[in-house]
Amino acid sequence: ITTGLLQGFIDRANKVFSGTYADDPVAVDSKIRFELATVDVQGNELATPGINRVEMGTPAYGEVAGYINKNLLWDPNRILNIWVNDEIYGTNAYAPAYILDNGTVVPGLKMNSVATADEVSFTSYSEVGITLTVSSIFSINKGGYEYYLGTHFGLMPTVFSTYSGIPFVNGDVDFCSDTYTYELGPIALEKNTYSDDKQAPVIYYNSCNIMDESSASTSLTYEQVLRMRKVIANCPGRMFD
């Protein structure tokens, strides 16, 4: 794993989040940008930009997660934590766990309300970051991983499935009316829309939204950006400056 590999991921993500990766009529600029960390949370310079390597030999099952929770939960309001190891439950991202008790609602997410961000003490990697497997990291700059960034900032999948437990509300599953809801089917770029209105037309399209699985993963919509901005403003652990 090299700085160059990670920089490729950063460069792609920044183009997607700025709406400049592809000529997409619905893509917008989120004003969110990522960069590789050069210092740790104590202000010490990292030997390799973007990388904090930890040698653990051959850890027992569960030891890696315990070590991360105790030593490697860097301030999530300053640093996007991404851990790479095959011992921590695969490639995954987690929705925000907390929200300020100020009347703000992020539909579809179940969060604990707190009066201030200072009340929150993060104790688990699942509250603050993203996990990747060793094998997955080597394709990180080829696209698709923006899905995990979107999940981290409160976006929801755009697929309808009777098995997901996510309700179909007002013709939508992700609470963003400017995204297509597609029907679960074969793993492919080509998708078709889903509706509970049997008279509604079916639209066939090549998917490009970051929350479409098996997508070109090149764009965000306006309402998705509004949702992420709401999360950044109100959800401790996601409150970047």
What annotation goes with each model-predicted range?
Residues A65-F160:
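Active-site-proximal segment of zinc-dependent metalloprotease catalytic domains
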Residues T20, D40, E87-Y89, I137-F138, ...:
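Acidic glycine-/aspartate-rich tracts in secreted/extracellular proteins
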Residues S215-D241:
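Pan-zinc metallopeptidase signature
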Residues G4-D11, K15, G143, Y147-T151, ...:
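Solvent-exposed, polar/charged alpha-helical surfaces in well-ordered, non-transmembrane soluble domains
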Residues V128-L220:
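The catalytic-center signature of Zn2+-dependent metalloproteases
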Residues S30, P76-R78, S126-V128, N206-S207, ...:
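Residues that flank catalytic or metal-binding motifs in active/ligand-binding sites
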Residues I1-R78, D86, A233-F240:
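Propeptide-to-catalytic entry region of secreted or membrane-anchored zinc metalloproteases
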Residues D24-A27, S121-S124, V202-I203:
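Short, conserved catalytic or adaptor-binding loops enriched in Gly and charged residues
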